[in-house]
């Protein structure tokens, strides 16, 4: 698991020319897909089955039978709580995708506008209508919008990756704690 400490970390830049997709609409079918693959729910179901099996054994004392029934009730409550958590996480991930998609589109538009403006000012500079300092300022502004576009593309890709991980049943607990400490 993981990688060697001295292994080179390869980061591939996002594709900036792709079409921007919005997230699918929240539905019960989408929630069912997410809950079917969730490992916590599978664990809770297994715990309940174990408690049911323990409660059916004839060699148990009254206290042990009550404990098994309490374990079954606890598993039921925990299962419902986890389903609510998954539904809330799914809604958050879908909102994050749509927010990142809108931001990405805004940055694409701003970048194309800055590029056109910079190219026009380069032509004006050749004619002597714009000073070298003004041209450098516009170039810097254009490069700034390119950086913002790249950051928006990474955020968009990350939002989709988080959604895909949730839908595949991958837990994001450690990642969410790390992300919350960064912000």
Q: What name fits each language-model region?
A:
Residues 79-87:
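Short, charge-rich amphipathic alpha-helices with coiled-coil/heptad character
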């Amino acid at each position: 698991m993981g990688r060697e400490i001295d292994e080179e970390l390869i980061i591939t830049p996002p594709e900036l020319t792709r079409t921007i997709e919005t997230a699918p609409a929240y539905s019960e079918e989408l929630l069912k897909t997410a809950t079917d693959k969730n490992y916590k729910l599978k664990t809770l179901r297994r715990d309940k089955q174990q408690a049911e099996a323990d409660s059916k054994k004839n060699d148990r004392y009254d206290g042990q039978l009550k404990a098994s029934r309490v374990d079954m009730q606890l598993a039921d409550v925990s299962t419902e709580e986890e389903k609510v958590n998954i539904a809330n996480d799914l809604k958050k991930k879908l909102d994050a995708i749509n927010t990142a998609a809108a931001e990405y589109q805004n940055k694409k538009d701003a970048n194309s506008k800055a590029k056109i403006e910079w190219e026009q000012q380069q032509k004006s500079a050749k004619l002597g209508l714009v000073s070298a300092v003004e041209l450098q300022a516009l170039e810097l502004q254009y490069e700034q919008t390119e950086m913002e576009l790249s950051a928006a593309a990474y955020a968009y890709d990350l939002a989709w990756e988080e959604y895909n991980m949730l839908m595949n049943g991958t837990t994001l607990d450690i990642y969410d704690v790390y992300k919350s400490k960064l912000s």
